[in-house]
């Protein structure tokens, strides 16, 4: 395993650990999710380039599209929670039920 893969895997692991440790605030959870998605994107792009697998060259771009949609939904939820309750705690998400 090359150093590039080890560094990318370490970035993914650190983002996952951050998500598990700082899960009380919605903003920190969203940032950790974005770090995980970006490390997955880089890992997929490097793997496709190293293996010369040109048929799957659109897969990292599709992953980025889903990551952008996830970020937009997460930020809109963050704005709604912070405008309603004044904080960005994840516990407030249970109070948003109709």
UniProtKB/Swiss-Prot annotation:
GO molecular function: NADH dehydrogenase (ubiquinone) activity
Any Gene Ontology biological process: ATP synthesis coupled electron transport
Topology in membrane: Multi-pass membrane protein
Pfam families in the record: Oxidored_q2 (PF00420)
Domain of life where this protein originates: Eukaryota
EC number: 7.1.1.2
Subcellular location: Mitochondrion inner membrane
Keywords: Electron transport, Membrane, Mitochondrion, Mitochondrion inner membrane, NAD, Respiratory chain, Translocase, Transmembrane, Transmembrane helix, Transport, Ubiquinone
Reactions the enzyme catalyzes: a ubiquinone + NADH + 5 H(+)(in) = a ubiquinol + NAD(+) + 4 H(+)(out)
Transmembrane segments: 1-21, 29-49, 61-81
CC terms in the record's Gene Ontology section: mitochondrial inner membrane; respiratory chain complex I
Subunit description: Core subunit of respiratory chain NADH dehydrogenase (Complex I) which is composed of 45 different subunits.
Family: Belongs to the complex I subunit 4L family.
Primary role: Core subunit of the mitochondrial membrane respiratory chain NADH dehydrogenase (Complex I) which catalyzes electron transfer from NADH through the respiratory chain, using ubiquinone as an electron acceptor. Part of the enzyme membrane arm which is embedded in the lipid bilayer and involved in proton translocation.
Protein's name according to its UniProt entry: NADH-ubiquinone oxidoreductase chain 4L
Organism: Puma concolor (Mountain lion)
Gene expressing this chain: MT-ND4L
């Amino acid at each position: 395993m090359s150093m590039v893969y080890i560094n990318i895997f370490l970035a993914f692991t650190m983002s996952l650990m951050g998500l598990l440790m700082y899960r009380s605030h919605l903003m920190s959870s969203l940032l950790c999710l974005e770090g995980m998605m970006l490390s997955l994107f880089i890992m997929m792009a490097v793997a496709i380039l190293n293996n010369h697998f040109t048929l799957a060259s659109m897969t990292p771009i599709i992953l980025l599209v889903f990551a952008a949609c996830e970020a937009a939904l997460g930020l809109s939820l963050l704005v709604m929670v912070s405008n309603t309750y004044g904080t960005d705690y994840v516990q407030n998400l249970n109070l948003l039920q109709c």
